[in-house]
Amino acid sequence: MTQINKRRDFVKLLALAGLSLYLPAFTSDERKKQSNSKKNKEKDPVSEIEEAIKSNNVTYLKKSDEPFDELNQGFNLAAGKVPALIGLCMNTQGVSEAIMFARKEGLKVAVKSGGHSFENFSSIDDGLQINLSLMNEVKWVDQTAVSIQPSCTLREMYDALLPNNRIIPTGSCGGVGVGGITLGGGYGFFARKYGLTCDAVKEVTFVDATGEIHQVKRGEELMWALKGGGNGNFGVVTEFTFKTHPAPESFTRHRFKAYKLDKPRAKELMKTYFKYTKELPESCFAAFVLNYKTLVLLITNYGPKNEALDNMIKAFSEICDDVSIGTPKNLAESLRNYYGIEYPIYFKNASAGYYENYETIASSIDQVLDIVFRKRGLIYQINTLGGNINNPEFENESCYPHRSSPYLSELQYYWDEKKDPTALLKSFDEIQNILYENGIRKQYRNYPSLGFKDWERAYFGDSYERLQEIKKAYDPENLFDQQQTVKLKE
């Protein structure tokens, strides 16, 4: 049993045992009458409830309740937030009740599924965290469609889908929740062939900021918004129906390393990466990972051998110091190698821009490398996108605005509790500013940073005004309001 499942069992036991406060549910008539005018009041909302009524749909936990800290903990230990209450929801009706309670008590709301938000947007200081930890079911609708609740992790999703020889184009980090990755776009090994995670969504169950429950299908305006712009902006998705795709029979990984790099060699390796990756077939994914003065280059393939891949392998075999040529392996076994750490850690990770080619970063790369080469532990990574991500049909059906860019970069830094990260985080910001000043301003919403300038355009591009209209329709009182949520028009 995974650590995540053990935590879920622990929390569920406490909830069912009645070890926390239960608050009253609200009717649909009450929903329409509620006002959010109490948002600034200082008193504890729990103290206002004169008679606690048990609800089978949602359990409310105070800071003094035993599972509160466990439920509130996000993946990033460096981005802690403490809500006034946690609403542990058992089902969609529980989410509706929790939203209505928050409106009545003037509490702002955040939504936690997997808790992997880099800036911990899945919690909120002094507000209500709608916690979906217990909503992780996977149910087959038919032979090719599957219903998945938002707190299901990618590990759990693959465990359910792969025995049926089906996949969804999504990521590889095992502890990430389906809800967050889907609503922000979602990419991984299979995206170049099948599109983003959000592109596989056929239908969702959605609870808006009044507590009203909607069944949303492809082609609707709200579905357009949820595909790339749905992370905590105007409501809660409690269930997704996905189209699945045939799982490949095998998966092959090739790895190359280059050590003790200087700037000229690093730039030459990077130019070679851009040259050959643009020719790769859709079954291939590549990542250029520069950690201090060491490069690790990853290439994966789940299709047949092909000339473009052979050419890239040959080119990097000649210029790298360490070469590991892979052979086809079992898909499930291969994916487990990329599940990564599934317990909370200290880190800073953020998008470092979308690129078209090497020329996109040519004017800034010398400055970027200067910083990476003097800061051990700072990681600069460039991943391949492209392929079917840039499908016009997918583009029309989603608000995700960056489909034409074939590369996505990111910055990463990890540290332990005893280390002071201040200097490295300053270098992190320096790189972000260099990229911005050199015109690299498009960013991936699932890799957020509070340091991004003009984040509205960075994440959503020309889709932002349309998202504001949807915000007005489904969250007119701005219940979902954090630093980088879509804002109501003034």
Regions from the PLM with identified roles:
Residues T2-E490:
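Soluble FAD-dependent oxygen oxidases
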